[in-house]
């Protein structure tokens, strides 16, 4: 699609990548990549540094040079934390792409690399599209990493792409990482043969957290609507990386108490109204409710997960009995 050259930027005092359009290549693909990278701000996505113009026309751009190692399969045995952090970086990058209304459309190991500081970066957005325009009559795909639905054109002759395409490609990439660089032979067929539900990650038995294996397997579902959103994958992986590190601060009448891994359970009661909250290492969950209880003015039931800052009300205000308790949940960050 483009000619790529590594150059030294004397102003930035570092190497950069210069991408210019190859003769005879569709300019729109270069513009799609530039547009995508200019829109997205993420520590896990390569950044555009400058635009190159000739006679007022864009002919190329400058992006950061990723000078670290290519991604490789994880050598077994590996710690659960190593696996979770590896996959989290990829999931977070794709999630950020989707949060900016973009699709990557070519997620695979070759399009990722670690920078000098060890942060994984996703690059090569030449096939990237806005969610609202992610369709094409000409099908570009990478064998092994593309889901079955893109091989069937719609009545308008277009091949339609959704976020679920990137989710499937993430699932294959994750499997490649955990399975010694190998993926199922059926995935290379055109179209790929994908079972309705996957148990590939569960069979690997390298991820100790069952819910993580289940979620990763769901990324490889044949039906796109059964695949999770990347922000859901990012969230669960992050929760397990930070397991046991969360805190909830409860404040009532100037008095404070904390729920954390050392004190994981609390019960708050006013008359016949009460709520029990438990910390399971991943988050704070309502375990029991009696009488009139509201969280941020909404009725709550057992199983509800409390996030952020909320106000817990015990007692019906119309009955003259009301106690308000503030709850603040900490937001620890995944550090590399």
Which residues are covered by each model-predicted region?
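Catalytic-loop of the protein kinase fold
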Residues: 98-114
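Activation segment signature within eukaryotic-like protein kinase domains
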Residues: 86-87
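Conserved short submotifs of the Hanks-type protein kinase catalytic core
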Residues: 56-69
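ATP-binding glycine-rich loop module of kinase domains
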Residues: 3, 7-27
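Terminal C-lobe "cap" of eukaryotic-type protein kinase domains
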Residues: 221-246
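Conserved activation segment of eukaryotic-like protein kinases, specifically the C-terminal portion
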Residues: 137-153
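AlphaC helix of the eukaryotic protein kinase fold
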Residues: 25-39
